[in-house]
C-alpha cells in the first residue's frame, strides 16, 4: 500500500477503528522515498535527455499499477513541451491495454483531479501523445521514441528484446522505475553496472546505453508506514513482505 496520492489514485485510507492486530508490509524498512515531485522531475528529465540526443528510451514496467501513472506523467509532460510532439510514446502490453478499459470504467474510484477532469468531459485515459503498440512488428525504431514494455525486470518478453537490440548504442537509454529482484537482469544493471550482458541467443552484448533508476514503487516507506500505524493504534503489529 501507499499513503502517498499519485496522479490518479488516492492514498491508502486509515481505518476508523483501532484494530487489535495490524498486518502491514515492511518492504522498505526504515528507508524513505523521494517526494513525488522530485521523482517525476528526475523521470521526465531522464526521458527527455535520451530522446533529445536522438536515442530510444526503454521503460520496463509491470503491466498494472505504476504503468498507468507513468503514462499520465509522460502525456502531461509532452503536452507542455512542443519540441517533443514528434516523438512517439508507446505502451506495449495487451494486459495494460485491458487495464485501461477498467481505469476508464471506474473513474469514480480515482482521485479528485481525475474525477473533476472527467466531469468536464476530459477523460485522462484518452491520451494525446501515448498510443498502444498492437504488435512489436509494427514498431519503427529508426527515430527517437519512448517504449514502455513489460516485464519490469527484463527477464523475458518484449522489454528484454528491445534492451538487447538497443543496449549497444550509447545514444539510447534505459529508465528503470520499479523494484527489481536479485538475480534478474534489471537488478544486475542497476547494482553491478556490467560492461556486457549475455543475450538470449548466447551472444555477449556491450552495455553502452545510459541507465537511470528512479523508484516509483507502490510500497510504503518508513514515514508512511509509521504514520499509518500511529493513526491505527493497534495492540499488535505483524510485519510481512520485508
Feature locations, PLM:
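Active-site metal-binding loops of divalent metal-dependent hydrolases
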Residues: 1, 26-28, 62-64, 94-95, ...
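His/Asp/Glu-rich metal-coordinating catalytic cores
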Residues: 1-69, 73-88
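Flexible loop/turn segments at secondary-structure boundaries
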Residues: 4-6, 30-32, 65-69, 97-100, ...
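Short secondary-structure boundary/capping segments
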Residues: 38-40, 73-78, 104-113, 189-193
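A structural signal for short, well-ordered beta-strand segments and their strand-loop junctions
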Residues: 58-61, 89-92, 175-176, 239
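Short, conserved secondary-structure transition motifs
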Residues: 65-66, 84-105
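C-terminal regulatory/interaction regions
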Residues: 76-79, 124-242
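Ligand-binding beta-strand-loop-alpha-helix segment within the catalytic cores
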Residues: 108-130
